[in-house]
């Protein structure tokens, strides 16, 4: 009916001109007292809606929310095409069209920045960096020896492309890292996350992945597409992680392992062995979550 919605809000904070959503039975009491004009909701819950709130019936409310959030968002971070006179640009770099570089950022040699890139203040880009179109790089980021594909977002304080924690075991001789980091398209890297360059080849983060804040990804790690990795996760060197893997906060993954597709690793888990496709693991050492739960129950009864 061509209704106008001013905001997308949570149920408890919504008002008469807002759109909200319901996806969790824990908030059923809030649903009954809702003030919003309309609610994204599954059909089985519409009986709890007050008469003034119109239902927008979907099968997956949270997915609908994710899509709508991008319609409602205020896109205030996008390039205006202005390079600050306080930025430092190497003559051996190449900058394409409509690139914004804010004050005190440094673009080093052998760096190429393609169209419509935004770079915040006090960031250090290069050397040996290629940034593709429509990338957003926030303040205080450092990127070296890296390729960032299109439509990625690198949040404040991230560190990409530094040398990894590699040395010979007996003598502690440092191993020189000559590889790089590759961030594939439409991936988000959280604040203060560190991704080390490979020893020889590439440390790779797959496309459409979401890496949270304060994550450590070591040299030669390969993470396939659609990964979701929560804060304070550490992944040791040369581990390979499959598609659509989810890793909970503060989990640790040992080096030189293979984690299959569609794996879920619960928060605070310690992964010491390979994990097959479609497994859900928890605990230390990480094991099938059903076994882990049985052990927790057994120990609690002692």
What are these regions (language model features)?
Residues 21, 82-288:
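Structural signal for interior beta-strand "rungs" in well-ordered beta-sheet cores
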């Amino acid at each position: 009916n061509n209704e106008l919605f001013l905001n997308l809000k949570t149920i408890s904070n919504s008002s008469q001109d807002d759109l909200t959503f319901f996806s969790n039975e824990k908030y059923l009491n809030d649903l009954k007292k809702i003030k919003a004009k309309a609610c994204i909701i599954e059909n089985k819950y519409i009986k709890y809606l007050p008469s003034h709130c119109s239902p927008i019936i979907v099968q997956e409310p949270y997915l609908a929310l994710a899509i709508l959030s991008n319609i409602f968002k205020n896109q205030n971070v996008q390039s205006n095409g202005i390079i600050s006179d306080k930025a430092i640009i190497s003559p051996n770099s190449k900058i394409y069209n409509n690139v914004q570089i804010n004050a005190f950022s440094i673009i080093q040699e052998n760096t190429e920045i393609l169209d419509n890139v935004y770079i915040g203040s006090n960031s250090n880009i290069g050397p040996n960096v290629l940034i593709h179109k429509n990338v957003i790089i926030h303040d205080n980021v450092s990127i070296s020896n890296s390729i960032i594909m299109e439509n990625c977002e690198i949040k404040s304080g991230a560190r990409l492309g530094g040398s990894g924690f590699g040395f010979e075991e007996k003598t502690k001789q440092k191993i020189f890292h000559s590889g790089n980091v590759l961030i594939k398209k439409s991936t988000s890297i959280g604040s203060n996350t560190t991704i080390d360059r490979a020893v020889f080849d590439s440390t790779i983060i797959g496309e459409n992945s979401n890496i949270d804040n304060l994550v450590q990804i070591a040299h030669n790690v390969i993470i396939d597409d659609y990964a979701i990795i929560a804060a304070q996760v550490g992944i040791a060197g040369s581990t390979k992680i499959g598609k659509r893997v989810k890793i909970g906060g503060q989990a640790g993954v040992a080096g030189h392992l293979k984690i299959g597709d569609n794996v879920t690793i619960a928060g605070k888990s310690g992964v010491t062995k390979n994990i097959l496709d479609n497994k859900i693991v928890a605990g230390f050492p990480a094991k099938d979550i059903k076994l882990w739960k049985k052990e927790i129950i057994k120990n609690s009864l002692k």
